[in-house]
Amino acid sequence: MVSQSIGWGDSPVDLCEGSNRAFQDTDQPACQLDVRLLRHKASWINPLCVQQPLQELCPQRPTVQSSENHVVLDTPSPLRLSILSYRDSLAEMPLSENTADVICSNSAHCSGGKEGDFFLATEEQEVHLQQESLLKNPKTVATSPSPKEGSARSESPHLTASTDDGDARSSSRSHAWNFFPLETFMLPADVEKENLHFYAADIIISVIENMKCNLPNQQQPERWDTEDASRLRGTGAEMTFYTHIKQEPGSSASSHTGCEGCAALQVSPVAETLSYCPVAGEACKHDLNKLVMLELGKYNDITKGCRCSYNSSKSATCESNLSPAGCLARELFRGFCKCWMLSEVNCQLPGSPTTASSGVGDEEYAEEDFDSSVDAAREVMLKSRVPGTEDWVLPRCQIILTVHPPIKRDIAVVAQNFFCAGCGTPIQPKFVKRLRYCEYLGKYFCASCHSSAESCIPARILTMWDFRKYQVSDFSKWLLDSVWHQPVFKLLGGHHSLYAKAKELDRVKDLQEQLFHIKKLLKTCRFADSVLKEFEQVPSHLTDECHIFSMDDFLRTKKGLLAPLLKDILRASLAHVDSCELCQGKGFICEFCQSTTVIFPFQTTTCRRCAACRACFHKQCFQSSRCPRCARIIARRQHLESLPTAAT
């Protein structure tokens, strides 16, 4: 592996004492690796305060650069001692154990003086080399030396240090390390910033590896032990989320998914381990979504019988007169009930007493459980209530205009077949007294469908003008609130007698008739825009049609709020008609008395309209048998019939 380091010319000079020692080959074990060689890209910058003492105290020595096969020495120069910048002396060199030992031994054996002068750059050359390094490729600057340096260097095939005087080497090296301050061996801020991405990459990689290690442990459920696995093989059933992996020597592990419920596991003396299979888990979830009822191969015939009965019931249901929604609800209900009851056979825990028993006992228990489940499913289906059946019908949104006669609770519940009228829940006879009566529907509801809400009953208002509030079910409360402001009550038919019982309603009826006729007249006048805006104070159905009211209109009439408002609108309309020439020109003249006073249809107190020709006359003058306008219409029709046709 290749690591990056700097030339020995840039490193601090070790102050060594003693006689000069030549470099020679030796088999002595390598010395301790220098800490500076352990870094990926190390560089040392001596502060200015240390450079001057180094020029005076440090001896001259060659700069050593080693590779796998050779070591490069920088020849000396008689220039002033100076420390080269780390930017100009960076060099790439492959490190190995031998070369690292050689470099360490060389640094320990070095001495000054008699070996020769070293190549040292002056401060001016330092600045010049730094400027040139900015213009060059960093990789080129780091790997290729300058021509001058190349000419001054010589290569030697092998460079080793002698093994003598080990104590002297250690003492000189410790003296050299203690001489420099701690700031000398600290990396500058620029180098730390350059190496910041290495630290970030290491942190990210460690976090990702921890997540990969913890993720399978979180997803994998609790495994069964070997004893539970053997019990599971005895029962002949398999859990879908696990696979059996047989580990045999000399053979690859083979897996059996177990998605097929009828497949029996092979028992072998080789130890088997249970492992989680994501493919099998997805297949099992897919099967559960499709409502797989039973996966025991031994009960295929029973399952087929259940499917046949289910298909027959399905066809019978579809042939009935139920709505598509009701038919679908019934089919889904039956399918869910059958799936829920039959799935209990497959959901037996491996550590239960049933699975721990013999295989024959398990089969008998499964058969009994299956039969009881089928019977229970049939019983639930028979007792279940689905909207549209004969014994229970869901309440419908309808307006009931008749008052229900009083009836005993027991008789009413029997008429409901002991079912709640709202949800169809079966009611036992001992709980009949807990049911609540709905005055609107005239039926009994359970506590979940009847929260004792109160509302006015439309039938009691139309028949007895009764605005008292009675308890109704939640469904009836919602229905009455939804139609409270809708004009759905017409009093012209069977409830016309209500005008005689409610005098205030009769006055509202008269005002409504006048406003109905005068509004038609005002719509034809182009000067009646301001008056028509007054009609917006009341609902439009009160002035567009007669004898049509809503529940809110009845209540406001009962409180005396509607009649004064209608009178104000009528007063403003009459004032406009009296002063408007266009409206006066659209009035009538009584043909019986030949009076010049203009009369209008909205004057219901003094005028009357002919039912045939819709002409307006005074009440005391009008005679239906002698209507002059009807007589003219009949005479004109007879005259047209007596005229000869164009063909004759």
Swiss-Prot record:
Subunit structure: Interacts with UVRAG; the interaction is direct and promotes association with the PI3K/PI3KC3 and HOPS complexes. Interacts with STX17.
Bias (Polar residues): 131-146, 157-173
Region (Disordered): 131-173
Record-level GO BP terms: autophagosome maturation; autophagosome-lysosome fusion; lipid metabolic process; regulation of glycogen metabolic process; regulation of lipid metabolic process
Modified residues (Phosphoserine): S144
N6-acetyllysine PTM positions: K469, K509, K519, K559, K619
Ranges in coiled-coil conformation: none
Key words of the record: Acetylation, Autophagy, Cytoplasmic vesicle, Lipid metabolism, Lipid-binding, Membrane, Phosphoprotein
Compartments reported by the entry: Cytoplasmic vesicle, Autophagosome membrane
Official protein name in the record: Protein associated with UVRAG as autophagy enhancer
InterPro entries, per database record: Autophagy_HostDef_Reg, RH_dom, RUBC_PIKBD
GO cellular component, one term: autophagosome membrane
Species of provenance: Mus musculus (Mouse)
Lineage: Eukaryota, Metazoa, Chordata, Craniata, Vertebrata
Phenotype caused by lack of the gene: Mice display an increase in the ratio of liver to body weight and significantly lower total ketone bodies in the serum and liver after 24 hours of fasting. Conditional deletion in the liver results in impaired autophagy flux, glycogen and lipid accumulation and liver fibrosis.
Chief subcellular location: membrane
Membrane topology reported for the UniProt record: Peripheral membrane protein
Record bears the keyword Lyase: no
Paired cysteines (S-S): none
A Pfam family the protein falls into: RUBC_PIKBD
Region (Interaction with UVRAG): 183-222
Origin: domain of life: Eukaryota
Function: Regulator of autophagy that promotes autophagosome maturation by facilitating the biogenesis of phosphatidylinositol 3-phosphate (PtdIns(3)P) in late steps of autophagy. Acts by antagonizing RUBCN, thereby stimulating phosphatidylinositol 3-kinase activity of the PI3K/PI3KC3 complex. Following anchorage to the autophagosomal SNARE STX17, promotes the recruitment of PI3K/PI3KC3 and HOPS complexes to the autophagosome to regulate the fusion specificity of autophagosomes with late endosomes/lysosomes.
